[in-house]
């Protein structure tokens, strides 16, 4: 595939990225009588497999990784090629991206935007707000390790497999009567890539191995069984390349001989060989590049040399499977799975292949485990896999869709730990972004625009049409709260609170009052990458910014309460949030993308940013905001289904949230086409961009379980194409691990394990018929209520598992969570308040309830429990309309305690209020398992 430099891509984007970038799709033809090989069957079909080698096609090679080290494995008979990456090898070196001309020109830029002089505003942004340099730097490869194994003649029974259950690529074939097998895996515990070659006839393995690289490198042979590649990253954008790296490959043989000289490793007549690859980098962090890269490479290699292959393999498996095995999924299998993976993709449009959806789902989880681990860099636009010095969009971090999308499946598919690199990056950005905030806006806090790189560039890049977007850092910082909703980890929140606060502080300092509408708005900003008039995207207060800022300011305020600090800041954050522009329905019945009802010149643009409120956020919901919900559907109809890989993936998530199973599944199918999925299942923008893989995994999870609305909604968008199946180990906000088994499109059995005490609200079609609920831990039947026909509510206890099932359904072992909750999950919230055995109740007599704050988009309530309560162990607040319909349920928010008084605050209702005057709402608080039912009525007046 042709490499795409940033500038080429920008030219293409200017012309409308979709059309300009589409390559010719590849093809693959069905094999008559094909059957899945034993390795794929042993993996329960969770394997990519092929009957041909990758040749020179990088998009046929198979990825392995341990978060830091990555390799693409080609599996050619004559030459094995491992294309190597290390996740800190970035072009250039530390730089300060802030442009000191910005702040002095900001007032004039804003004036031009408010005067609708968008083009003139963009000109001034070009002159004064662009980063230094005006583009960011690229993630670059280490090079290749090639094993020249001899001619490929006389070969039969060739297969190549990437087993997702073992994170191992295996290549095996028969050549001249000898069965050769190669296994490759990247070990996180031992920090090496392991290539194991075996043959079933003694002394049959002979090869020469060498490194090569597009970087500036020197090869050598440091000892008789090792070769080395010492290099430095490339110069770019006027910044001198400064990341030094050392790659070592060392052979351990049984039988035969091994020698190394002049950078060539020679193995002759061996019976088995283990090649260990170790890579060290001098990158310490975004501002320091003087690490002992040679020492790091050698130390890891020497340590791995003392470990035999069996132990290397078993440690790798234990480490990997502890993550991967948390989620099991079965969507059914047809004979389509007996074709090689590339054939399955090529035939997908005409085949019934439900297992491919399961494979795609698990591949995303595999890729996240392999590219993002505690202590590594976050997964970039290509995860960690890149063979080019000038990769598309620099293989960096694009924040206006791609980087957040990479992490959508992290919590929902039970890979909480894999999320951590993002929070490390956010803390870095809170430093580099603070300089940009000061220099370009004269503001406190920190800001990051639409991209960042290994050096944590935070300024405007690429040009105003793309780069002049203020809310990149805001989106990333809001993920801190989102992650907390899953884990309940107060220590995590405390550690990351300063970055969250700083992101909010920037907007408290910079939002400006719209001259005619009176709302507080960002200016200048854009609705990502979409021109509202020809060639201009810059505007004030685009809808996505307002949605992101509602989440950010809420998150910062709520976090400040959990952490117990900053009351003044909190009040300011809330007051500011209340003055953000509400979402509006435009003339076409759509969600308006900008403050004005403009019609975008490019109607089918890939970004649908203004539906951020539908997904990933929860500001547009079916039951909470019915009008906006319908407008969201209309918005998607107007934009159409087509788009880049990541755009399709986001649309799976959108349609899942719209509970439209057929459409969500159509989008899954649209993604599984040869122009959107490479033979190795890498998602194609095109070109390759990994966000589509992660977005697809997230979308499939959203089709099976949603938890954004204060309840666990089971099978909200189950397509007819998956009539029977099971999934287990999915995670829901509030700290739940969930399994479900279904047949005929309906749940037979739901199993939920609670991390914390609380009130569990389950929504499923199952509850419209006969069902039973059991506390699996002791076989008892917990008390339940039925707030809606398809909703069951019950009090749950930390560590216990609950099962709801149709009467007579035999428990399905695979839907019961088998692995413990992620280690980051704390027992209760907050840890400073020890659980108590007395179950005091916030009954109507003991509690007072009042609306504390209201605004056009919602309001907050407060319940104060004044007698008999010693501690809160779990609580929820439910808002209902006067007719009893539940409109919102809240688990997040804050409670505090002073003596015997317990206060639950900020139990926000975030839906739309019916227009005009006063609306009566019911406010139901459940604290320590008791509830004030019937609800206390509160009246809210729309302002
Ligand atoms: C944004 C998108 C492009 C591409 C790039 C990396 O600019 O609009 O489609 O995904 O990021």
What are these regions (language model features)?
Residues 840-943:
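Extracellular low-complexity, O-glycosylation-prone Ser/Thr/Pro/Gly-rich "stalks"
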Residues 2, 8-28:
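N-terminal export signals
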Residues 61-84, 88, 108, 128-129, ...:
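C-terminal capping/lid segments that line or modulate ligand- or cofactor-binding pockets
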Residues 205-213, 753-767, 871-882:
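Surface-exposed beta-strand/loop patches in extracellular or lumenal glycoproteins
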């Amino acid at each position: 595939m042709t490499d795409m430099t940033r500038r080429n891509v920008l030219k293409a984007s200017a012309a409308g990225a979709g059309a300009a970038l589409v390559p010719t799709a590849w093809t693959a033809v069905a094999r008559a009588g094909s059957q899945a090989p034993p390795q794929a069957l042993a993996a329960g079909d969770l394997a990519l497999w092929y009957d041909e080698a990758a040749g020179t096609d990088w998009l046929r090679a198979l990825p392995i990784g341990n978060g830091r080290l990555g390799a693409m494995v080609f599996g050619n008979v004559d030459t094995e090629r491992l294309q190597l990456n290390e996740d800190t090898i970035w072009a250039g070196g530390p730089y300060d991206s802030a442009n000191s001309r910005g702040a002095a020109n900001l007032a004039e830029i804003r004036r031009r935007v408010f005067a609708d002089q968008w083009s003139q505003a963009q000109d001034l942004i070009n002159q004064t707000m662009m980063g230094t340099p005006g583009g960011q730097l690229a993630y670059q490869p280490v090079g290749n390790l090639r094993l020249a194994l001899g001619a490929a003649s006389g070969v039969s029974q060739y297969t190549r497999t990437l087993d997702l259950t073992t994170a191992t690529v295996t290549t095996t074939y028969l050549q001249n009567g000898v069965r050769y097998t190669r296994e490759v895996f990247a070990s996180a515990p031992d920090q090496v890539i392991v290539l194991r070659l075996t043959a079933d006839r003694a002394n049959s393995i002979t090869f020469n191995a060498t490194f090569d690289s597009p970087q500036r490198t020197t090869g050598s042979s440091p000892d008789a069984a090792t070769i080395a590649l010492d290099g430095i990253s490339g110069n770019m954008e006027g910044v001198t390349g400064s990341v030094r790296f050392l790659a070592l490959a060392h052979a351990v043989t049984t039988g035969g001989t091994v020698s190394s000289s002049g950078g060539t490793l020679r193995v002759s007549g061996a019976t088995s060989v283990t090649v260990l690859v170790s890579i060290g980098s001098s990158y310490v962090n975004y501002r320091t590049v003087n690490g002992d890269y040679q020492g790091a490479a050698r130390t890891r290699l020497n340590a791995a040399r003392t470990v035999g292959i069996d132990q290397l393999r078993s440690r790798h498996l234990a480490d990997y499977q502890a993550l991967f095995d948390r989620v099991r999924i079965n969507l059914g299998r047809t004979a389509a799975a007996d074709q090689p993976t590339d054939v399955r993709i090529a035939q997908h449009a005409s085949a019934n292949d439900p297992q491919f959806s399961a494979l795609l789902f698990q591949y995303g989880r595999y890729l996240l485990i392999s590219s993002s681990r505690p202590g590594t860099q976050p997964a970039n636009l290509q995860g960690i896999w890149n063979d080019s010095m000038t990769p598309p969009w620099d293989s960096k971090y694009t924040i206006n869709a791609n980087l957040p999308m990479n992490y959508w499946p992290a919590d929902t598919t039970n890979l909480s730990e894999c999320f951590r690199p993002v929070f490390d990056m956010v803390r870095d950005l809170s430093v580099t972004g603070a300089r940009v905030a000061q220099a370009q806006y004269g503001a406190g806090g920190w800001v990051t625009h639409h991209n960042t790189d290994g050096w944590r560039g935070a300024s405007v890049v690429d040009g105003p049409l793309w780069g002049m977007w203020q809310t990149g850092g805001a989106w990333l910082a809001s993920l801190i709260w989102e992650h907390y909703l899953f884990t309940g980890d107060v220590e995590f929140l405390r550690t990351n609170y300063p970055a969250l606060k700083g992101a909010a502080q920037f907007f408290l300092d910079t939002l400006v009052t719209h001259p005619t509408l009176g709302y507080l708005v960002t200016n200048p900003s854009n609705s990502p990458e979409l021109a509202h008039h020809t060639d201009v995207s810059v505007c004030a207060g685009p809808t996505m910014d307002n949605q992101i800022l509602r989440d950010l300011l809420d998150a910062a305020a709520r976090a400040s309460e959990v952490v117990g600090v900053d009351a003044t800041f909190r009040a300011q954050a809330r007051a500011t949030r209340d003055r953000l522009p509400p979402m509006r329905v435009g003339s076409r019945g759509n969600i308006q993308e900008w403050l004005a009802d403009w019609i975008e010149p490019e109607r089918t643009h890939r970004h649908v940013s203004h539906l951020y409120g539908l997904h990933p956020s929860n500001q547009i919901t079916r039951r909470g905001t019915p009008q906006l919900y319908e407008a969201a559907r209309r918005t998607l109809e107007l934009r159409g289904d087509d788009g880049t890989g990541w755009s399709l993936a986001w649309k799976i998530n959108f349609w899942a949230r719209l509970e439209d199973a057929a459409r969500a599944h159509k989008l899954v199918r649209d993604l599984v086409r040869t122009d959107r999925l490479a033979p190795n299942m890498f998602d194609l923008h095109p070109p390759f961009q990994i966000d589509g893989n992660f977005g697809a995994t997230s979308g499939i999870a959203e089709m099976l379980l949603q938890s954004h609305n204060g309840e666990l909604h089971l099978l909200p968008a189950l397509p007819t194409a998956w009539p029977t199946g099971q999934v287990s180990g999915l995670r829901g906000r509030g700290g739940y691990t969930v399994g479900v088994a279904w047949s005929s499109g309906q749940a037979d059995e739901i199993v939920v394990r609670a991390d914390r005490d609380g009130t569990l609200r389950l929504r499923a079609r199952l509850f419209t018929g006969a069902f039973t609920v059991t506390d699996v831990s002791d076989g008892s039947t917990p008390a339940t209520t039925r707030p809606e026909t398809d909703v069951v509510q019950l009090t749950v206890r930390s560590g216990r598992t609950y099962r709801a099932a149709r009467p007579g359904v035999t428990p399905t072992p695979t839907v019961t969570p088998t692995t413990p909750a992620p280690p980051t999950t704390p027992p209760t919230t907050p840890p400073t308040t020890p659980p108590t055995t007395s179950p005091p109740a916030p009954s109507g007599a003991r509690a007072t309830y009042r609306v504390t704050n209201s605004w056009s988009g919602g309001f907050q309530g407060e319940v104060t429990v004044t007698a008999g309560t010693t501690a809160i162990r779990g609580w929820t607040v439910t808002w209902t309309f006067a007719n009893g319909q539940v409109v919102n349920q809240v688990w997040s928010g804050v409670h505090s305690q002073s003596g015997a008084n317990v206060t639950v605050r900020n139990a926000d209702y975030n839906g739309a209020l019916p227009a005009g005057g006063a609306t009566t709402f019911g406010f139901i608080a459940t604290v320590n398992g008791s509830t004030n039912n019937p609800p206390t009525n509160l009246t809210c007046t729309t302002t």
